[in-house]
């Protein structure tokens, strides 16, 4: 101890050493113990005092300490508020109980009473169990009124008492028409991929990187995109506007309503004013698996080249976002513990990863574009590894094969499936699929949703996808839910959108017929209670089924969906209600049906056929009983690449392109594939296809070939009709403008020159012994030989053109060449006249024809037929921008104007997958034609007319070969509400 040590003695040379310890003076033992206790007490006292002082000082320091001078206290407090938001998982915004729509403007539109409507509420009748409801019990249309106030549906009743209707209410009489909520399209690119497509306007994909969670579709949304209004005319009131699928993570999507500017009831013209939920309760993100990212980004120096690279990019992105989430959580935890004044840095924020971090927090509904089993499984694995839910898989062609994988998705809620009804075969990922997927998914307890992927499909007709789903077996209520309540719920808006119910947004559609029927169109659309069309065109539908009951139970789906058709030579049919054939045009009396006997591939009896049935049954012939069968000629698929291509996006599976070379389709046939089986299944027993020019499948260059779709190879008996070469095809649409040095004038000028040169040398054949020519000269001579046949009226010149200007130029060239030919014929010698005959002029056909109605009278005067491919163009390209959208925007469509002018019209294919829908196209023309067409005339649009326009003579339809002798007719099961033919 210090007090026991005296000072050192001064140094002196004479000083003696200290005495030994044994001789030193000792204190008494008691004294030493007392000193020790004293010192211990003093040390403890000092320690306690020090502790108290330190504690007081720390308390004082904490209360008075300020953040470092380089940090803003206001921002730190904002950061703390952000912490609170980061840890809140959104709840679906409430609907019922609101006093007004969140989008409603004070002083907005007047109340509206919609009277006398056949209402589909989107819910089964009260008291229906969930099990019964899913099975289709408790659903019905019922007659009633809907009151709309302050942007909301405020009351739905069988008959609204006058006392409950505001005095200033607008009264709209629905006249017994069907009323539903607005259609919700959960996959659209409207506004970011404006039409017509121009490079300067396209903002679909931010392809600068493969991982772009920071991209936002709203920043590219163009409110003046014309298709926003066209889509609305199909009853679509809300759309999820997604970035494209070029990137594995494409960015944020936004849910909009199709009301634009003051005319539509909005306060301003802006993307922000179109948001369906101004509070942005939920956020949405687009991700994409598979082929697209590999194709767009993959190379030797950039990922992904394979799906392995894609998974790494996904996982690395999720890891980085997870790191941001952890850093934020750590900051928030510490700030909550010690106070923001103790923080020496702001909350970690990173704009690049903020949205993806929010997805990992469950604040973003992830929408993943994934087609295949391996892509679906990989994405589900990612969701479990990084613990985030997936709200929906889009496209998902193979999802019906793997419900177990889907049910393993993290979070306990399996994703919904946003699908097409029958759009497939366009790339390898879409090669495995079935139009029955909607039914199969529903039966597996999953949620099918039909979408447009606009402009891939015209979202104006997205409800037709649901109708096709119903046709392929999805229950009626589930089919209608697939474009109303199901997408609304999946988007987190199930308390505001998708139902006709008090408290829901007043997004309402009144239809001219059953919305799941062919050709259904709105007569009026309301968004937030504001009527969207001042003077809507209402179609006259003499064939529509009138409803007399106040409660209508929806039709059942077809009882059997046959995956593969059966070819038989002998069969008996019961339950046929309509026969539409050249020699037979018979309809059964109301409530009755017809029997049809077919023996040896030919119809032997129509009617009661008692004797024929007895003899045939005794001989073991099978009997097929139908509910509402129609017997008619089969269909012809024209305009696509049927028989020349199997997977559109995979060049190895097709004949290839012919931008420079004139070829014959008969030399490139590839039969026996899925497309042709699908065609045959749909009653399309014949197809006429030309070699592809370039670009899409609806460009043509060379001679077309006629094939029977059930043939396995071109050597099968009767596999080819039309003598091997049907028509001579050239493409003169926008695809001829492929380079800076290519022009319309050059393309049309080249055709004129070829025709004139063929006519000048029309009578001369190659002389025996003449000098051999090279391959290029041979090809030119072959092309010239076919053009001579065109000039001699032996073959049709089929031109693929959409623009009215292009069609006008083609008609001028035809007139010019015809006059030259007439003059030359007058000067020819008798020998030449006998050899080639006298031409009556070029027989021309137009394929495509999106703007043909603008020159309808000229087409009729020139006797030029038009094969509309498709029936109703969407105006996707500049040369088709004047296409007519139809009711309620325009009085009639292209086909109506052409028929009125006397033009012979057929319906063809824009893409091969449409081959299943030719009957629907004919039905649409029939239902929406205002009585212009009989049932048989409508069917001729996809049969006889096509053959006549392309010059296939009647005797060529049924060649003498075995396959042809069977006759081309088909028996289809038709649901009354689905097709009025």
Curated annotation (Swiss-Prot):
GO terms for molecular function: metal ion binding; N-acetylglucosamine-6-phosphate deacetylase activity. GO terms for biological process: N-acetylglucosamine catabolic process. Residues 823-835 have a biased composition (Low complexity). One of its GO terms (cellular component) is membrane. The keyword Transmembrane applies. Zn(2+) binds at residues 187, 189. It holds the Pfam family Amidohydro_1. Residues 1-36, 86-107, 819-838 are annotated as: Disordered. Belongs to the metallo-dependent hydrolases superfamily. This is Amidohydrolase tasK. It comes from Hapsidospora irregularis.
């Amino acid at each position: 101890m210090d007090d026991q040590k005296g000072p050192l003695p001064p140094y002196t040379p004479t000083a003696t050493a200290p005495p030994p310890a044994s001789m030193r003076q000792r204190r008494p033992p008691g004294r030493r113990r007392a000193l020790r206790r004293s010192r211990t007490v003093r040390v403890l006292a000092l320690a306690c005092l020090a502790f108290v002082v330190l504690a007081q000082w720390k308390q004082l320091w904490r209360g008075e300490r300020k953040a470092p001078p380089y940090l803003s206290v206001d921002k730190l407090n904002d950061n703390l508020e952000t912490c609170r938001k980061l840890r809140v998982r959104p709840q679906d915004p409430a609907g019922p109980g609101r006093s007004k729509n969140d989008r409603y403007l004070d002083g907005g539109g007047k109340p509206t009473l919609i009277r006398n409507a056949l209402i589909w509420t989107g819910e089964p009748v009260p008291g229906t169990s969930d099990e019964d409801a899913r099975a289709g019990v408790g659903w019905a249309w019922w007659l009633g009124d809907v009151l709309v106030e302050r942007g909301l549906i405020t009351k739905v009743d069988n008959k609204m008492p006058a006392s409950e209707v505001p005095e200033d209410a607008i009264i709209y009489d629905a006249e017994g028409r069907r009323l539903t909520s607005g259609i919700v399209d959960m996959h659209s690119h409207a506004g970011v991929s404006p039409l017509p497509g121009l490079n300067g306007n396209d903002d679909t994909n931010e392809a600068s990187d493969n991982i772009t969670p920071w991209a936002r579709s709203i920043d590219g949304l163009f409110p003046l995109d014309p298709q926003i209004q066209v889509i609305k005319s199909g009853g679509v009131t809300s759309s999820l506007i997604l970035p494209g699928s070029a990137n594995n993570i494409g960015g944020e999507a936004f849910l909009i309503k199709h009301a634009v500017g003051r005319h539509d009831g909005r306060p301003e013209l802006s993307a922000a004013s179109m948001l369906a939920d101004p509070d942005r309760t939920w956020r949405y993100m687009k991700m994409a698996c598979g082929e697209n990212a590999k194709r767009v980004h993959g190379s030797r120096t950039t990922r992904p080249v394979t799906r392995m690279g894609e998974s790494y990019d996904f996982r690395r992105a999720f890891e980085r976002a997870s790191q941001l989430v952890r850093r934020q959580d750590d900051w928030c935890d510490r700030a909550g513990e010690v106070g923001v004044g103790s923080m020496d840095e702001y909350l970690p924020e990173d704009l690049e990863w903020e949205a993806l971090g929010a997805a990992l927090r469950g604040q973003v509904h992830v929408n993943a574009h994934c087609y295949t089993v391996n892509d679906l499984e990989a994405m589900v694995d990612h969701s479990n590894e990084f613990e985030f839910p997936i709200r929906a898989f889009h496209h998902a062609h193979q999802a019906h094969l793997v419900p177990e994988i889907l049910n393993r998705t993290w979070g306990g809620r399996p994703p919904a499936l946003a699908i097409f009804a029958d759009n497939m075969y366009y790339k390898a990922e879409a090669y495995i699929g079935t139009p029955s997927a909607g039914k199969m998914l529903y039966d597996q307890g999953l949620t099918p949703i039909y979408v447009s992927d606009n402009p891939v499909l015209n979202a104006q007709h997205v409800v037709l996808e649901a109708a096709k789903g119903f046709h392929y077996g999805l229950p009626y209520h589930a089919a209608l839910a697939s474009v109303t309540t199901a997408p609304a719920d999946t988007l987190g808006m199930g308390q505001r959108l998708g139902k006709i119910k008090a408290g829901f947004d007043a997004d309402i559609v009144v239809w001219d017929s059953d919305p799941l029927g062919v050709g259904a169109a709105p007569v009026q659309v309301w968004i937030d209670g504001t009527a969207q069309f001042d003077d809507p065109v209402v179609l006259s539908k003499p064939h529509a089924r009138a409803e007399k009951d106040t409660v209508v139970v929806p039709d059942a789906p077809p009882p059997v969906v046959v995956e593969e058709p059966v070819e038989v030579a002998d069969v008996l049919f019961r339950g046929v209600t309509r026969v539409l054939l050249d020699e037979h045009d018979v309809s059964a009396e109301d409530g009755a049906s017809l029997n049809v006997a077919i023996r040896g591939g030919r119809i032997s009896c129509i009617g009661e056929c008692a004797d024929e049935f007895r003899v045939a049954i005794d001989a073991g012939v099978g009997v097929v009983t139908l509910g509402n069968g129609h017997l008619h000629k089969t269909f012809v698929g024209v305009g696509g690449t049927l028989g020349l291509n199997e997977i559109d996006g995979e060049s190895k599976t097709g004949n290839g392109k012919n931008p420079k070379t004139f070829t014959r389709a008969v030399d490139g046939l590839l039969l026996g594939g899925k497309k042709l089986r699908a065609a045959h299944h749909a009653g399309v027993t014949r197809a006429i296809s030309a070699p592809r020019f370039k670009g899409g499948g609806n460009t043509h260059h060379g001679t077309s070939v006629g094939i029977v779709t059930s043939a396995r190879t071109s050597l099968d008996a009767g596999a080819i009709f039309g003598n091997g070469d049907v028509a001579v095809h050239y493409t003169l649409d926008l695809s001829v403008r492929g380079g800076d040095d290519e022009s319309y004038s050059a393309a049309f000028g080249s055709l004129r020159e070829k025709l004139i040169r063929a006519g000048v040398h029309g009578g001369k054949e190659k002389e025996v012994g003449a000098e051999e020519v090279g391959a290029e000269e041979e090809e030119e001579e072959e092309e010239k030989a076919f053009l001579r046949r065109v000039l001699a009226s032996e073959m049709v010149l089929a031109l693929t053109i959409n623009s009215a200007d292009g069609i006008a130029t083609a008609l001028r060239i035809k007139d010019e060449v015809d006059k030259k030919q007439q003059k030359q014929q007058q000067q020819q010698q008798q020998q030449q006249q006998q050899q080639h005959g006298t031409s009556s002029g070029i027989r021309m056909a137009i394929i495509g024809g999106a703007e043909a109605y603008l020159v309808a009278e000229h087409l009729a005067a020139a006797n030029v037929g038009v094969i509309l491919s498709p029936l109703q163009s969407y105006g996707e390209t500049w040369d088709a921008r004047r296409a007519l959208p139809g009711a309620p925007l325009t009085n009639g469509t292209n086909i109506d104007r052409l028929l009125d002018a006397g033009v012979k019209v057929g319906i063809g294919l824009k893409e091969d997958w449409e081959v299943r829908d030719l009957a629907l196209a004919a039905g649409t023309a029939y239902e929406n034609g205002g009585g212009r067409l009989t049932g048989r005339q409508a069917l001729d649009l996809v049969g006889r007319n096509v053959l006549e326009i392309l010059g296939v003579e009647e005797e060529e339809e049924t060649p003498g070969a075995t396959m042809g002798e069977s006759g081309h007719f088909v028996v289809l099961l038709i649901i009354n509400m689905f097709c009025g033919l």
